[in-house]
Regions:
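Mg2+/Mn2+-dependent nuclease catalytic core
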Residues: 1-99
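Generic detector of bulky aromatic hydrophobic side chains
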Residues: 11, 32, 138-140, 148, ...
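Hydrophobic/aromatic-lined pockets within catalytic cores
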Residues: 18, 42-52, 107, 111, ...
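Mixed-charge, glycine-rich, non-catalytic linkers/tails in nucleic-acid processing enzymes
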Residues: 57-62, 93-155, 159
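Accessory alpha-helical DNA-binding modules that contact the DNA backbone or grooves
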Residues: 147-149, 157-174
């Protein structure tokens, strides 16, 4: 990673095997790695505030690595063989927008969330998604969904179907 600027870059350490893409360089979006990529983007933005320059890449040092390319499996047992590369300008450009939207959402919840209602939901984001397991919140979701006749209770109707219904003035399956 070369540039004309002298600056710091983020290298995070994870005690896990790095799942690399077929190029053997960039990290796959598997398991927790989407979250790790977002985490490193936030670290990179914080670093940018300090040094006035945003590095285009961040790295993860894992305990080992592996990837599959052209019918062959490759792997290494040393954490120093390869770093997992996160490229915010090319391969992982979507991470930048995802983090930006997540930060906007957190700020919106902090500033306006106290005014919202879940019974009935006052925003589309507050409707339950019955197609997803939410652990300990499943009973609460089910209660709300039953009360409002949520569209995602219908077999094969997810959030996209609910959004289509909302656009056509349909708020319930009843």
């Amino acid at each position: 990673y070369k540039t004309d600027h002298v600056h710091y870059i983020v290298i995070d350490i994870k005690f896990s095997t790095l799942p690399l893409r077929a190029d053997g360089i960039h990290l796959l979006n598997s398991g927790n790695y989407n979250f790790y990529k977002a985490q490193l983007r936030i670290y990179t933005e914080a670093l940018q505030e300090l040094q006035g320059f945003t590095p285009s890449k961040a790295f993860i040092l894992g305990r080992r690595w592996n990837y599959h390319s052209k019918g062959e499996d490759f792997s290494g047992l040393s954490c120093f063989d390869k770093l997992g590369v996160i490229d915010f300008e090319k391969v992982d450009i979507n991470v930048v927008d995802t983090v930006k939207k997540a930060i906007e959402w957190v700020r919106l919840v902090r500033n306006e969330g106290k005014e919202w209602s879940i019974d009935p939901p006052s925003r589309p984001e507050l409707y339950p998604n019955m197609c997803v397991d939410s652990g300990e919140w499943n009973d609460v979701k089910k209660e709300i969904a039953n009360k409002i006749g949520d569209i995602t209770q219908i077999w094969y109707c997810g959030i996209k179907n609910r959004e289509i219904g909302f656009l056509n003035g349909i708020k319930t399956w009843r």
